[in-house]
Amino acid sequence: MLEKLEQIEARYEELGRLMGDPEVIADPEQLQKHARAHAALEDIVTTFRRYRQVSNELAEDKAMLEEEKDREFQELLKAEIERLTGEQERLEQELKILLLPKDPNDEKDIIMEIRAGAGGEEAALFAGDLFRMYQRYAEKKRWRTEIISSHPTELGGFKEIIFQVEGQGVYSRLKFESGVHRVQRIPTTESGGRIHTSTATVAVLPEAEEVDVEIKPEDLRVDIFCSSGPGGQSVNTTYSAVRITHLPTGLVVSCQDEKSQLKNKEKAMRVLRARLLDMARAEREGELAEERRSQVGSGDRSERIRTYNFPQNRVTDHRIGLTLHHLDQVLAGELDEIIDALVTTDQAERLKNMEA
């Protein structure tokens, strides 16, 4: 591990020198490329330098303890050795996590799809609650959200809503949200006051660049139609809505939220690229051995991942057994406590697999 860390430190220093090179400074593209690579290594190099400093101090204190005759000073040294040993172990664990292979999609923007599941109108209302929860979380993170396509219901829910989230590290934070979300509450339309259970499905797709997925024009069928509003009523007399079918896979994407046919087509293509990339990823992961899969979950959309219980103000993530009793705050976008726990569990599982 130390040899690898020394190589990373040498590369970090080399990048620092390159950023000061007049030729590189004169080329903004090269400068930006080196600056990004330098910033990506900063955390691991800072942690490694502190680890090395602590290790040196620890070795010096142990050597001094062997020579020291004064009882009082021996006790001081022992206390300092204990403190430094604890810090060294903590830093070593941090370095192991920092050395874990990065998910190549972690820095990508995402396309999130939320669909109402079992439960009729109540499921559609819950899909709307989830959309607003992620929207508020994005606001707190200073990320940008944009609705790509939506099918609203008359009571303010969504049969389906597809939206983009752009910002730093979006996929790394939201990738564990894929799966079936379950709600338990008394519907406003329920006169008997009985608790109903409804579901919504969330899919998180890293946004695909054109270079990530090759789509041949002859593989697409593009249909143009009039857009419609809640309950199927016509809201637009111009043919601006777009439906794209990818013939080799049978994937179909529709978009009607924009007044411009061109913009709807662009948005639909964005979703199609992301879905094709996700399909390729799922095929690759399907080939992996079961023991190499993350404990946090495979992102399988049929996996029930979380329950939101309104009467008890409780949210439970079933993958890690985490229960919180402030559902109201979670729905207001306070998701970090859950996401941090999921990330930590994923890191621990990957460390265990690497050490095995």
UniProtKB/Swiss-Prot annotation:
Free-text description of this protein's post-translational modifications in UniProt: Methylated by PrmC. Methylation increases the termination efficiency of RF1.
GO (cellular component) term, any one: cytoplasm
Biased composition (Basic and acidic residues): 284-306
UniProt keyword Protein biosynthesis present: yes
Disordered, as annotated region: 284-310
Pfam families attached to this UniProt entry: PCRF, RF-1
Function recorded in the entry: Peptide chain release factor 1 directs the termination of translation in response to the peptide chain termination codons UAG and UAA.
Family to which the UniProt record says this protein belongs: Belongs to the prokaryotic/mitochondrial release factor family.
Protein name: Peptide chain release factor 1
Species name: Moorella thermoacetica (strain ATCC 39073 / JCM 9320)
